[in-house]
From Swiss-Prot:
Record-level GO BP terms: cell division; protein import
Signal peptide start-end: 1-21
InterPro entries: 6-blade_b-propeller_TolB-like (IPR011042), PD40 (IPR011659), Tol-Pal_TolB (IPR014167), TolB_N (IPR007195)
Protein name: Tol-Pal system protein TolB
Organism placement in taxonomy: Bacteria, Pseudomonadati, Pseudomonadota, Gammaproteobacteria, Alteromonadales
The UniProt record lists the keyword Cell wall biogenesis/degradation: no
Taxonomic source organism: Shewanella baltica (strain OS195)
Similarity comment: family membership: Belongs to the TolB family.
């Protein structure tokens, strides 16, 4: 009990350190093992300079996925081509890439642009070329065109990335998603800031600024709302905020701890931690009616609830076995079972969207790392190699995890692929950033 109590206290204290508002992704591992792909600069078919380089967005997305490695443009056998009609299969025989993305951009009325792109299967194109002349339909994996405004260039670049990623992997892309996190800057009168940004840290927006700590933001399943803990009234309270209307609703303000909110899969309830009856326990609260139901009842601390995708069970962190471990409770029967056994501590768990794995913080030999456990085989893989990792949040397609860690004495955000190959940092230049949460598909 003392160990988990100290961990809970540390979580509060860690919300009192300074931060910055812009995030930059620094890839630290995994690019060399990625699959080679060619992305051509989209050909601008208008006067002057192109409004934006949409291909740069696509290349950056594919690199950050940890799955693909765009080739250097200077080494590509063809230049300044934007359509499949200009593609020459024989020229690409020695490139070694599995696919090619190319496209065009041209003016289409006032502040409107027609963006076209093609996705070519290079392996199939070369194999077919060996047999003689072939039709583009035999190796063209996708071809689309869309009219967008100048303000939509980056967003549509993410959309192209989603299409390319899904066509080549069979997994839905998550490049149009967003992240939320907490920033702290003690040079300001209201140092705590709840932020939302695109998954890559661009288009950052501040939702709330407070003189008191903010923590544990989490997304609703429809991506319209955030739940979080605020100490703005000198005590822990849970709020739900609509991202579009900015309307805030206080959901929980009981005496003692009100913490660790997690939306139910239907978005109608929150699993939360309350200490109003003594020890911290897991409860479910109806957001509309505020009706609560107690889920756990134990003398040890129970905290950090997270839902199974089917909404029938919760996992949570408890010290009921002597040290912090992750347990599962079936909501219909109340049956509790221990889920983790390896290492000294295991805590802060969440189930991947496919329901097959659990992502959590594992402590072994005093080091806190992000780990993944296969729920069928119980095989556990430590994904990170740093020391003070916390607050993992899984991308909605289950391929990446964003989490908090410490780098050069500062708390930053970082990302790791769920197979552990790809790693990146999202450092803040002037302080610290923490408590990340990845949105659902938007």
């Amino acid at each position: 009990m003392k160990i988990l109590a100290k961990w809970l206290a540390l979580a509060v204290l860690l919300c009192t350190t300074p931060a910055k508002a812009a995030l930059d992704i620094v890839i630290t591992e995994g690019v060399d093992a990625a699959r080679p792909i060619a992305v051509m600069p989209f050909v601008w078919q208008g006067p002057g300079a192109a409004p934006q380089a949409i291909a740069d967005v696509v290349m950056s997305d594919l690199v950050r996925s940890g799955t693909f490695k765009p080739l250097d443009e200077l080494g590509l056998p063809q230049r300044n081509i934007g359509t499949v009609a200009q593609f020459q299969a024989n020229s690409w025989s020695s490139v070694g890439a599995e696919a090619l993305v190319l496209g065009t951009v041209k003016p289409y009325g006032t502040d409107q642009y027609l963006v076209s792109f093609d996705l070519i299967d290079l392996v199939k194109a070369q194999n077919q070329a060996l047999k003689g002349p072939v039709s583009a339909t035999e190796f063209l994996m996708d071809s689309r065109q869309t009219v967008i405004s100048a303000a939509q260039f980056r967003q549509y670049g993410h959309r192209i990335s989603d299409i390319v990623y899904e066509k080549l992997t069979g997994i839905r892309g998550a490049f149009l998603t967003r992240i939320s996190y907490v920033v702290v800057n003690h040079t300001q009168k209201a140092p705590y800031q709840l932020m939302v940004a695109d998954y890559d840290g661009v288009n950052e927006q501040m939702l709330l600024r407070s003189p008191e700590p903010l923590m544990s933001p989490t997304w609703s399943p429809d991506g319209r709302r955030l739940a979080y803990v605020s100490f703005e009234n000198k005590k822990a309270e849970i709020f739900v905020q609509d991202l579009y209307t900015q309307v805030r609703t206080k959901v929980s303000s009981f005496p003692g701890i009100n913490g660790a909110p997690a939306f139910s899969p239907d978005g109608k309830s929150l699993a939360i931690t309350l200490s109003k009856d003594g020890q911290p326990e897991i409860y479910i609260i109806d957001i509309a009616t505020k009706a609560i139901k107690r889920i756990t009842n134990h003398y040890a601390i129970d905290t950090e609830p997270s839902w199974y995708p089917d909404g029938k069970s919760l996992i949570f962190t408890s010290e009921r076995g002597g040290r912090p471990q992750i347990y599962r409770v079936e909501l219909s029967s109340g049956k509790v079972s221990r889920e983790t056994f390896e290492g000294e501590w295991n805590l802060g768990g969440s189930i991947t969207p496919d329901g097959r794995s659990m992502i959590f913080v594992n402590r072994t030999n005093g080091k806190f790392n992000i780990a993944r456990m296969d729920l069928s085989t119980r095989f556990m893989q430590v994904l990170t190699s740093t020391r003070l990792d916390e607050s993992p949040s899984v991308a909605p397609n289950g391929t990446m995890v964003i989490y908090g860690t410490t780098y050069q004495g500062k708390q930053v955000l970082a990302a790791v692929s769920t197979d552990g190959r790809f790693k990146a940092r999202l450092p803040a230049g002037q302080g610290e950033v923490k408590s990340p949460s990845w949105s659902p598909f938007l």
